[in-house]
Design a protein with these regions (language model features):
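Structural microenvironment flanking redox-active thiols in thiol-disulfide oxidoreductases
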Residues: 126-164, 174-180
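A short beta-strand-turn-helix
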Residues: 84-87, 92-113
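Thiol/disulfide oxidoreductase modules built on the thioredoxin-like
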Residues: 159-166, 173-221
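Bacterial N-terminal signal peptides that target proteins for export
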Residues: 3-15
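C-terminal motif of bacterial Sec signal peptides marking the signal peptidase cleavage site
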Residues: 22-26
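Short active-site neighborhood of thiol/selenol oxidoreductases, capturing the structured segment around
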Residues: 103-126, 132, 144
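N-proximal helix/coil linker or "cap" segments that precede and/or mark the start of modular domains
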Residues: 35-92
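Bacterial signal peptide processing site
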Residues: 28-31, 123
């Protein structure tokens, strides 16, 4: 993997300081924390989302960054099963893969799976990013899936995922369609899904260490 792996110690120390600095539980979309210093623009407050680049440019950037293709019945990554939604499972919603080259039906996903809802404009998301990357590095038995949420800049989102060393599949939800079904107040918001497709735990707000994420995965998955 790329990026943070080459300077993981410094990144982890910086992440710890950032988590302390961001003492809020997460980023409410109406009042986003902008770690880049840029105005996140429309979309984070419920208005229409105007992407910063075309789908093709996002797709090209995603593939250049080595981010995995989104899951299908024939692909590696989270297990997909055709059939009805599972009671207590993910909502029966279909989201685009970041880049628009495919779609994923959430209700078809099976675990063990961790779904992390994030946005490139969200400061706490950036703070927890190294912990997610380290967990994914050391726990290949747990599948990872991201959802870029309420984000008007998918191009910047791909750049963030690349810098964060996130190579797992990423979906896109610019219109916040998962907000109600998954009770997302704002990112980061993380959902744990078991092998039967049931939601077994939800963590609202940023992780403060890799160990915290490991403990939750061991307890619930």
């Amino acid at each position: 993997m790329k990026g943070l792996k080459r300077s993981r110690g410094n990144a982890m120390a910086l992440a710890g300081a950032m988590v302390i600095a961001f003492s809020i539980a997460g980023c409410a979309p109406d009042t986003p924390v902008t770690a880049t210093g840029e105005d996140p623009g429309q979309g984070t407050g419920g208005g229409p989302v105007t992407p910063d680049v075309s789908d093709q440019e996002v797709l090209d950037a995603r593939r250049a960054a080595g981010i995995d293709e989104c899951p299908t019945t024939d692909a590696s990554g989270p297990v997909v099963e055709e059939g009805p939604a599972v009671e207590g499972g993910l909502p029966d919603l279909t989201l685009d893969c970041l880049g628009g080259d495919s779609t994923v039906r959430l209700a078809s996903l099976r675990g063990p799976l961790i779904i992390n809802v994030w946005a490139q404009w969200c400061g706490p998301c950036r703070a927890e990013a190294p912990y997610l990357a380290e967990f994914a590095d050391t726990h290949p038995e747990v599948q990872m899936l991201g959802i870029d949420y309420a984000d008007p800049r998918p191009g910047a989102a791909v750049a963030f995922a690349d810098e964060a060393d996130w190579d797992w599949p990423q979906l896109s939800d610019p219109d916040r369609s998962i907000a109600g079904p998954l009770k997302v107040v704002g990112p980061p918001h993380t959902v744990f899904v078991d092998a039967d497709g049931r939601i077994v735990h939800v963590h609202a707000g940023p992780f403060t260490s890799t160990e915290q994420l490991e403990d939750l995965a061991a307890e619930h998955l």
